[in-house]
């Protein structure tokens, strides 16, 4: 990983980042297809959405690049006060993805470290994120940075019998 760089994303990075984002959606959908959406045109939709975000204030969109090839990204932004979530304005990490070929080599750690730094530089008094309950490796990474569990989302599907809690 000596040639790894973490940098601000550029417009030319968006097709690769959109592919990564689509893979992240598919990963979550595979975990729980009732909870996580998966629609046609994910790549184009993400490319269009992130193109607008790239030009927005308070957005952190970073690319991990090794040997001139993208191998991960993180998307975060400063979010305003949210009364529904009882949350003051904060930095929120929405996506972090590392290509499977370079996982467990420090790319995710470097992306997360830089995203936190950039959000704090933008004035975030705290950084929050969500992670799938089943994604234990991500939870360990986030925990190593001092993230703690503050909420637990629970979902119930209409018309389905209750499942026993473990």
Q: Model-found features: residue ranges?
A:
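Conserved acetyl-CoA pyrophosphate-binding loop and the N-cap/start of the following alpha-helix
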Residues: 102, 106-114
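Conserved GNAT acetyl-CoA-binding A-motif
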Residues: 120-130
């Amino acid at each position: 990983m000596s040639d790894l760089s973490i940098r601000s994303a550029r417009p030319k990075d968006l097709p690769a980042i959109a592919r990564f984002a689509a893979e992240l959606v598919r990963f979550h959908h595979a975990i729980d297809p009732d909870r996580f959406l998966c629609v046609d045109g994910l790549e184009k939709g993400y490319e269009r959405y992130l193109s607008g975000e790239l030009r927005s204030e308070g957005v952190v969109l970073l690319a991990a690049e090794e040997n001139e090839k993208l191998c991960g990204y993180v998307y975060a932004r400063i979010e305003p006060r949210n009364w529904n979530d009882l949350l003051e304005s904060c930095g929120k990490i929405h996506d972090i993805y590392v290509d499977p070929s370079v996982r467990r080599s420090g790319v995710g750690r470097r992306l997360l470290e830089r995203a936190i730094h950039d959000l704090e530089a933008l004035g975030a008094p705290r950084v929050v994120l969500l992670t799938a309950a089943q994604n234990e490796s991500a939870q360990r990474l986030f925990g190593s940075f001092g993230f703690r569990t503050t909420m637990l989302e629970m979902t119930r599907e209409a018309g389905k019998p209750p499942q026993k809690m473990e």
